[in-house]
């Protein structure tokens, strides 16, 4: 009997290796060569969680009864803390028993929601530019991607007139992300209201990914503030950015009880819950003071952004000073034929790693993104290196 070669699943051909996975290997090699690359590319908060969060984790970890499997639907303490958080900051009422599903980071929620709502061949609306995982996971699961445009001259908001001209008959899901990554376009009440109206008129489930609402943003908003939104919309939230807990992998989705039950049915077949210590510590973090939030999410990032803005100016890039979030998004000068002409020069000559906007879609091809997830002195050092070169 002839030996058959082992081949990967066909779905692997639908996606490529994540840009940062590939590029970080190159950066690691440059560092191994002694180049000392400063990374301003990844949105991984470098500050610690609040002290009481870590204390609670340690306290629970010492309890010998805390190490067993946990319910997939999350502990009551965590769900209640999530509901209280939404009421406190967004004035949104959620039933902690039926309208909240804790997640192992909101990224896994993209998988769960797609599995729960989308059949192979169904269409999914994905923003351009947008978070690449919306596209890659949809492709892996057999959905057809339909991009909708976000443009600078429209404040990086959906163009509803353009959307209404599209054939929406096969669309099941629409991904939105406000405040927006990578562009920093902020949430707007009128956008949220139009999204709810759009979802109801076309029987589309709108999923708003909302991890950035506290970063450099004085007025956090939720899509679920719109009356009737829970009937047709899902919102993700995450502790990674707003609570400095990216490695803890704690997120949530909020919506109506029926949608939650479908998502839980998928999730219960995929994982076995999150360590109890992480859940109870996360519940503690949701009670962080307003002073903690202001220092961590407004004041610290504001100080860092001043240096990032100077980097943009030295490179000849233009940017919207009203953008929010933990990145700075800027348009490159016309003299560059391609964004990588700029980012590769910055990497190899200034030894600073910044993100080219094309990885987020064709509408990002002439933009760069600078992460604010580095100490002020590091961003200033990056600025000094870039200033030392002629641009």
Name what the model sees in each region.
Residues 2-105, 112, 285-288, 390-391:
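N-terminal small-domain helix-loop-helix segment of the aminotransferase-like
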Residues 116-138:
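Conserved PLP-anchoring active-site segment centered on the Schiff-base-forming lysine
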Residues 122, 143, 201-205, 230-231:
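A short helix->loop->beta-strand "cap" motif at the edges of active sites that frequently abuts
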Residues 141, 201-202, 315, 350:
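Helix C-cap/helix->beta junction micro-motif
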Residues 146, 164, 336, 345-354, ...:
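PLP-dependent enzyme catalytic core of the Aspartate aminotransferase-like
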Residues 146, 150-221:
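Active-site phosphate-binding strand-loop segment of PLP-dependent enzymes
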Residues 228-299, 306-315, 389-391:
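Conserved core segment of the aminotransferase class I/II
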Residues 283, 299-309, 319-331, 364:
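Conserved glycine-rich beta-strand-loop-beta hairpin in the small C-terminal domain of fold type I
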């Amino acid at each position: 009997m002839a030996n058959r070669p082992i081949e990967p699943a066909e779905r692997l051909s639908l996606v490529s290796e994540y840009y940062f996975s590939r590029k970080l290997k190159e950066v690691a090699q440059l560092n191994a060569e002694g180049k000392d690359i400063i990374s301003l590319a990844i949105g991984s908060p470098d500050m610690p969680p609040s002290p009481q969060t870590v204390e609670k984790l340690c306290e629970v970890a010492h309890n010998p009864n805390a190490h067993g499997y946990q319910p997939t639907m999350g502990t009551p303490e965590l769900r209640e803390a999530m509901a209280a958080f939404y009421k406190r900051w967004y004035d949104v009422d959620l039933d902690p028993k039926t309208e909240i599903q804790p997640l192992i980071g909101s990224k896994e929620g993209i998988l769960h929601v797609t599995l729960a709502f989308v059949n192979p061949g169904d269409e999914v609306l994905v923003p351009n530019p947008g978070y690449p995982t919306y596209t890659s996971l949809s492709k892996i699961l057999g959905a057809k991607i339909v991009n909708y445009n976000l443009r600078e001259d429209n404040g990086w908001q959906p163009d509803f007139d353009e959307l209404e001209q599209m054939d929406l008959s096969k669309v099941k899901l629409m991904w939105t992300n406000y405040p927006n990554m990578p562009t920093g376009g902020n949430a707007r009440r009128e956008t949220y209201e139009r999204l709810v109206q759009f979802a109801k008129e076309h029987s589309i489930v709108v999923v708003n990914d909302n991890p950035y609402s506290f970063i450099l943003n004085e007025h956090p908003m939720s899509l679920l503030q719109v009356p009737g939104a829970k009937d047709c919309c899902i919102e993700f939230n995450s502790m990674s950015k707003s609570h400095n807990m990216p490695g803890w992998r704690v997120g949530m989705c909020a919506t109506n009880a029926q949608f939650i039950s479908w998502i839980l049915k998928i999730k219960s077949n995929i994982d076995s819950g999150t360590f109890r210590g992480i859940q109870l510590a996360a519940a503690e973090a949701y009670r962080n003071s307003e002073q903690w939030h202001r220092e961590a999410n407004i004041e610290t990032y504001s100080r860092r952004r001043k240096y990032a803005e100077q980097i943009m100016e030295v490179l000849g890039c233009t940017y919207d000073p009203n953008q929010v979030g933990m990145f700075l998004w800027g348009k490159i000068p016309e003299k560059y034929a391609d964004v990588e002409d700029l980012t590769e020069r910055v990497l190899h000559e200034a030894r600073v790693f910044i993100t080219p906007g094309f990885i987020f879609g064709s509408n990002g091809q002439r933009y760069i993104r600078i992460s604010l997830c580095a100490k002020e002195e590091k961003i200033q050092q990056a600025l000094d290196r870039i200033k030392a070169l002629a641009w």
